[in-house]
DNA sequence: CGGTTTTGACCCGCGC
DNA sequence: GCGCGGGTCAAAACCG
């Protein structure tokens, strides 16, 4: 009897213990959940702070860029004079991005009439092409030099819209822009990006609306025409053409024009490299080809790029399907201290790395870019996972 | 229902 | 001046 009672006592005790254990476990779990919630709140706060900071920074950058563009033409004159004094090899007559000789008499008259207006307006339209790459942890001094070159080049970047722009934009708000472009007789710099990608609609950070498709005579594969739809008046266009019939074949994307609106984070990150390429191309008049080439090597150190002028369109072509390894880098490229992480669905492995440089075409297959974007994305994922 | 894509027609620069 | 061909328009279809 005693044994039975003892056993039943211990069974009851075990039951009580088990229940109390469960309660403790429950409490602990609740506490954990509470902690996670608190952390979640903190992260939310942090995220909103980061976003606020980013937005305010973006505003400041736009402001500063606007001011610098206004001042850059004066600065350019100053630098040109310095160049002359330094006996640099400068070919002033070469003006890539312009085709002044093609201006008709009719257009010349218009230019005379509105040239003063153009000088003022063009200052506001020297924004960078809205695409490019993200480059992290770059040597500050080198970047400063390059950015300086880019700014100077942007001052020269007076592009013209072709007749298609005249047709496409009929509202009066755009008329000034169109007249300006028409009168100067200039053609826009184009940047071609060749990338092997299964999806032709490369997400380069902007929103695009397809407005046409055409099969060219010389190429049986259709070419698609897209217009930037982030702003109703944005003049930026792109053409996408597949380079081969296979599904895996590369796409050639040709960008043309300047965005008239703030770019999203991805796009503004992307803007640096190709914008630099376009700008450097257009600054070919004031810098030697070797220095231009070297500068592009900094922005596109592991891929082929070429410069050409087709149909009076100065064109920078970036071939992301063909890795360009360090033997082709400029001598002073800081390979020893940093490296590059890039994976554009290219079968070739990226060079060995100790620091990260990231080219980030979101939508293309990129490899672990620890950019602000990805950090924010991770935060968002974590937050949504916890809620 | 609003935004996007499709697609035939049209425009116009350019070469001959 | 004419024809070719790249680029754009715009209405209809499609989609979420």
Curated annotation (Swiss-Prot):
Gene3D superfamilies given in the database record: WRKY domain
UniProt keywords, alphabetically: DNA-binding, Nucleus, Transcription, Transcription regulation
The residues that make up the annotated DNA-binding region are 197-264
Q: Where is the composition biased (Low complexity)?
A: 329-346
Spans annotated as Disordered: 322-366
Q: What cellular component terms from Gene Ontology apply here?
A: nucleus
Which positions, given as ranges, span the membrane? none
Q: Which GO terms describe its molecular function?
A: DNA-binding transcription factor activity; sequence-specific DNA binding
Task: Tell me where it mainly resides.
Answer: nucleus
What Pfam families does the entry give? WRKY (PF03106)
Where found in the cell? Nucleus
Q: Which domain of life is it from?
A: Eukaryota
In terms of InterPro entries, this protein maps to: WRKY_dom, WRKY_dom_sf, WRKY_plant
Give the protein's function: Transcription factor. Interacts specifically with the W box (5'-(T)TGAC[CT]-3'), a frequently occurring elicitor-responsive cis-acting element.
Its recorded name reads Probable WRKY transcription factor 36
Q: Which organism is it from?
A: Arabidopsis thaliana
């Amino acid at each position: 009897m005693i044994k039975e009672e003892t056993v039943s006592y211990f069974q009851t005790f075990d039951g009580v213990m088990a229940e109390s254990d469960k309660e403790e476990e429950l409490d602990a779990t609740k506490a954990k959940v509470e902690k996670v919630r608190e952390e979640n709140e903190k992260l939310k706060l942090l995220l909103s702070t980061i976003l606020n900071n980013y937005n305010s920074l973006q505003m400041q950058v736009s402001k500063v860029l606007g001011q610098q563009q206004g001042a850059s033409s004066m600065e350019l004159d100053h630098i040109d004079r310095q160049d002359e004094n330094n006996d640099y090899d400068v070919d002033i007559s070469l003006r890539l991005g312009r085709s002044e000789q093609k201006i008709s008499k009719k257009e010349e008259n218009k230019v005379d009439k509105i040239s003063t207006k153009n000088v003022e307006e063009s200052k506001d339209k020297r924004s960078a092409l809205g695409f490019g790459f993200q480059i992290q942890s770059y040597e500050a001094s080198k970047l400063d030099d390059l950015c300086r070159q880019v700014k100077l080049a942007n001052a020269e970047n007076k592009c013209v819209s072709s007749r298609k722009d005249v047709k496409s934009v009929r509202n009066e708000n755009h008329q000034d822009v169109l007249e300006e472009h028409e009168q100067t007789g200039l053609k826009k710099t184009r940047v071609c990006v060749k990338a092997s990608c299964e999806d032709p609609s490369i997400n380069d950070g902007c929103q695009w609306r397809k407005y046409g498709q055409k099969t060219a005579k010389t190429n049986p594969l259709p070419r698609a025409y897209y217009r930037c739809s982030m702003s109703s008046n944005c003049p930026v266009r792109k053409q996408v053409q597949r380079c081969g019939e296979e599904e895996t074949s590369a796409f050639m994307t040709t960008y043309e024009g300047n965005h008239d609106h703030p770019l999203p984070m991805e796009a503004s990150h992307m803007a640096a490299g190709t914008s630099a390429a376009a700008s450097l191309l257009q600054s070919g008049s004031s810098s030697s080809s070797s220095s231009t080439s070297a500068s592009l090597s900094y922005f596109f150190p592991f891929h082929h790029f070429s410069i050409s002028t087709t149909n009076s369109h100065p064109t920078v072509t970036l071939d992301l399907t063909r890795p360009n390894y360090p033997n082709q880098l400029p001598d002073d490229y800081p390979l020893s201290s940093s490296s590059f992480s890039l994976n554009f669905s290219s079968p070739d492995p990226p060079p060995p790395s100790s620091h990260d440089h990231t080219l980030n075409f979101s939508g293309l297959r990129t490899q672990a870019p620890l950019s602000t974007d990805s950090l924010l994305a991770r935060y968002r994922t974590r937050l949504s996972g916890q809620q």
